[in-house]
Amino acid sequence: MKNSSNIKTTKTNVHSNRFQVGRVLQVIVALVFLIFLGRTLYISISKTVAGENLSTRTAALYKRNQVLKATRGTIYDRNGFTIAEDSHVYTVYAILDHSSINYKNKPEYVVDKDKTAEKLATVLPLSKEQILKYLNPKTKAFQVQFGSGGSNLTIEQKKKIEQMKLPGIKFIEAPSRLYVNGVFASHIVGLAQPIYNKKTKSTDLVGTMGIEAYYDKYLAGKDGFKESSVDASEYQLPNGTNAYRAAKNGDDIYLTLDSQLQNYMENLLTRVQNKYQSKALTAVVEDLRTGKVLAASQRPTFDSQTKKGLTSSYTDLLTQSTFEPGSVFKILSFAAAINSGHYNPNELYKSGSLTVNGSTIHDWNVTGWGSIPLYEAFPRSSNVGLSILEQKMGATTWRSYLNKFGITKKTGITLPGEQAGMIAFKSKLDQAVTSFGQGVNVNVWQMMQAYSILANKGQMVKPQLVEKIVSPSGKVIQNYKVQKVGKKVVSESTVKTVLQGMQDVVNKQYGTGTTYKIAGKSIAVKTGTAQIAGPNAVSYTHL
């Protein structure tokens, strides 16, 4: 009886435990139900999940936004010849996954790798063996590209490959810039290169150098957009365009450059570079009356189309670099001495050497030409003669003219990164040597601007690279006119005297530029050489 009683007690306990567990489970289920009910009520009222509006999310599933790309403006020369224009490049890739089948149940993957490699090798700069390596990757891949050899393809290359009708061979299109002349004022025209835009998730052409960078906001234009309603299969619904803004194409820019002169200059510089293996060369042809630059180039340079010669350390030598001008600076010191009344052409001076503050200034002909009149100093390019004129002017007067000539002031040339230069002017020696272009650093545009006094009766004119900016509709937005810089620096009579001195450089037997004489032509010249800083950077080598 006792055992029977124990069994009954055990059964009662088990039943009680089951009942309690059941009650707990009921409570848990009820709580879960209440939580889900509360969550459902909250979502139905607030219409949000994790901070995201459900209506907006649902609407987005049936909408497609498309960026309408603007065409970048074209860059022309002064005569309307194209220098840079929009284009496209292509990257070829191969689909390898056998699941890629089109709606006609035909393969969209590479079927015959050997044949595909053989055909592609006739167009791409890759061998058949190299292409086969790409088509047989070590790890499984849905698709593969062909490295640099399969990118930046032209439309002609793309068409050749398409004509082969190779299954699985596809293309990715990307915006590009076509520079039709290759090496052509590359530092001035600059570059526009494709850069991925995270905001629009598309690739944009962005100016990174030269005119392309400086006028990027004009050239770039503004992308448009199109918002469309689609069905569950992502087909656009009839009348499904909800919002639309047309792309605004970029403005066209007409440069002052003359293509014929520019190409001729490029050829000349290449010949000089090849002959003398120069470390650096610069050249500018400018209409000093208007400031319009007709041609300009440098060495080293690069091919804008192929990028050959372009390095990360590339510098625009005309704008972003400064140099000691040497004897060509004598045009300015000569003009300042004349205009300030300190030039007596018939006054004699002893050439050859001059001591200033214990240091000796030498003429390029260190023995000199004896006692000669000051009017021979400029044609002979006499350092001593110009130093004497600087001493006659005095530091205050000479420095005031340097300021008027814009030395150490940026010209505002429409190119990125212009350097202002500097001048050493503390000691008597510093002041004297600036008269023949030492102790002063300038950029090329500063010198061209200062030289413009010779064509404008003493008035400086700013160098210009842009003729006009024209909208896509043909409206002239900006028309660049002659821009005077400050007040007249020197008088018209001073200019005439300087020009006579420059003609004497060519025409007089003692002139340094007699080799430039052309029969029947009146030519004004100033030759120039310079000393360069020695290895200790505190002295000059002698030239």
Segments (PLM) and residue ranges:
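Periplasmic/cell-envelope proteins involved in peptidoglycan metabolism and beta-lactam response
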Residues: 1-305, 399-404
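Beta-lactam-recognizing serine transpeptidase/beta-lactamase-like catalytic domain environment
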Residues: 2, 84, 231-241, 281-326, ...
